[in-house]
Amino acid sequence: MDFETSPTTGGATTSSRPTDTALSTRGIRVSYGHVQALRGADFDCRAGEVTALIGDNGAGKSTLVKVLSGALAPDDGEVFVGGEPFHAHQPTDAQAAGIETVWQDLALAPDMGPVANMFLGRETRRKGLLGALGFLDDKSMAAAAQREFAQLGVTADPRRRSVSDMSGGQRQGVAVARAVSWARTVVLLDEPTAALGVVQTKGVLDMVKRVADRGLAVVLISHNMSDVLAVADRIEVLRLGQRVASYTRAEASLEQLVSTMTGGTATPESDSTNSAGGTQ
């Protein structure tokens, strides 16, 4: 991996700036009062790859997603997007940097249809009289939604009037399609298969692979180790707010991941990373 040296915040003098990744974190720290939620969760995610973040409850996964999505500013450390420092104060800052998030609750408007949800707040308009007073271009938005659904394998009908009567897998598909249609660099997926059945889960995992195949970096947060091993190119293990190990899919087994998550083992890679100050 290529690195540059650059100034950091929080009193540190230098940090490693990754130059060959879509998304990276260095020295991220977040505290809630006396509780340290993150204390050095360093990881890298490359374009066209799925990077899974796993860990037991309290490992810091949710807090890290909030930092990456712009919903929470870290107390210290840096986030890099395309090798450049990224400072977000709100989710729209992350969206401006090409980062889109699919939250576990999907954040869909239940009384609106798939197309309206995909373009909510970003509606396409036709020019009105003298270039003003434009009208919503429903036809072009519906066509764009249909193309996105077809490319990702989403089975939902974009003509439906409401997403509330769709299956869980279909709603998940709408949320993923919305994120992919606007993302330029990274898609964050927070527990995308939670509460889904076997068939729906397979459909969502197939979508995750297609998103990465389009050249986007995908960060997958999941408790389901089978899902992680099915789609992840790299697996980062968090424990007590730190990245403690990193595996490729070929290196990892279910038993090894569970043992590392719970403190049973450490890998030579994680040991060398820690001794170099990467996750302290």
What are these regions (language model features)?
Residues D2-Q280:
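Glycine-rich phosphate-binding loops of nucleotide-dependent enzymes
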